[in-house]
Structures are given as C-alpha cells and as structure tokens.
Amino acid sequence: MFITDEHWRVLKPILEPAQAPRRGRPWKDSRAVLEAIFFILHTGIQWEHLPKSFPPKSTVHDRLQLWSGNHAFRKLLAKVVRSLAQKGRIDLDQCFIDATFAPAKGGGEGVGLTKKGKGTKLQLIVDGQGLPLGASLAAANVAEWHMVQETLDLFSDQTEPERLIGDKAYDCDELDETLAELGLEMIAPHRKNRRPENVTQDGRPLRRYRHRWIVERTFAWLGARRRLLVRWEKKLTNFVGFTLLGCLSLLLHRLS
C-alpha cells in the first residue's frame, strides 16, 4: 500500500469529485485507482501487466490522463509543499536546480534530439534537504534556463526560495534579471566564454555550489521510481503526471 489514511485525507479533496458523473460507468474508487498508478510508477510494469487486484487498466489509464490533464497532480504537489512549509519542514534558505535526460523509446510529444538520442528533459527544484518543490519537462534540446519559470510556477508565496543554486547551464544574464525581479538570487558558476568585464559572481555565494550533490541525490531517489527511467508515454502530459507523482511520493511521508 502506497497511500495511508492520513495521506488520503490530504489527497482526496483534489482527486475525488464532489459528485460522481451521472453518465457512463460508475466512478471507480479514486484511492484504489491512485494506488494502481503508484504501483506502475514504482515498478515500471507495462499497462497490460497490471495485477487484477487493482481496478481495470483502462480505468487506471483514463484516470491518469484525466488527473494529468486537469493539473490535479500539480495541485497536489503544491498543496503538500505548502503544508510542509507551514510546519517548518521545508528549507527555503537555499534551493537547488538541475535537469536530467529521460530517453523516449517510443517517441511522442515533447521529444528532442540530442547527442544522447531522442528524449525529454526533466528539471527539478529541491529544497536544502533535497525535497522536490517543483518540476517541469520539455524536449531534451531545450536550454535549461528557459524552463526555470515553468518550474517556479508551481510555487506559492509561502514556498518561494530565497536563492537558487545551479550549474553553468543557468549562467544567463536574462535569467538573473528575471529572477531578481521576483526577489530571487541565482547562483551559478560562469561559463568559460563569459568576458571578465561581465562577471556577476564572486567566490562567496559560490561556496553554496559545493552542495549541489543534494539535487543529484534527489534524481537518484526518483530513479527508484522505475517508470521515470525511460519515457514510454506518447503524451507528454502523462509523463508529467508520473513525474509529479514521483515527487509527491518523496514528500508524503514527511507529512506524518
């Protein structure tokens, strides 16, 4: 079982409709469906191999598409992050940002060609403990700094970080200016081609950069969710849904 009674009390208001649909088949138990989605997320099994102890695979797949399409998983992640922040369990003093590559074996939406092959880029923002606060996906050939705003869009006023720490992929004056307008400091080592007269970082803020292993560890945690290792979903929104659920699974046990 992936979902405890305490977890479900938090998740139910967003996932469970106030009134079941009047047309079509009866509305299956949302908790059982979510358990099935978590099972696929963790094991990486194909849909046709979903055990019969779960609701039918067609029901589970349809609900994944529904919840991914109506941003239910985004709302859940934001809600849990906000709840943890209110309890003082989120470290917003310094947050880390990075991206990784997920090969897309079956192609589909939002797939880009790189030296590693065709795939999708996953960007994460984590707090000082490595807890995922926001995630976004794009074609693998999209520059990482272009994805930052979308990743930040998951945040509320209560969960905005004070500073972001990233690698050279985030050394961009335009990004620095955009984040500064939001009251957020971007810390990243300079690219080799930056001219000396345009240097914006000194050694003091960059001392925080040595802790970037924190976000790399979070990617390793997510890698234990086998459905995220390779993208099989044709629809980008469905892979986004699995990704956000992976982040959510890392946060739920902190609610206790």
PLM segments and residue spans:
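Short alpha-helical elements
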Residues: 1-256
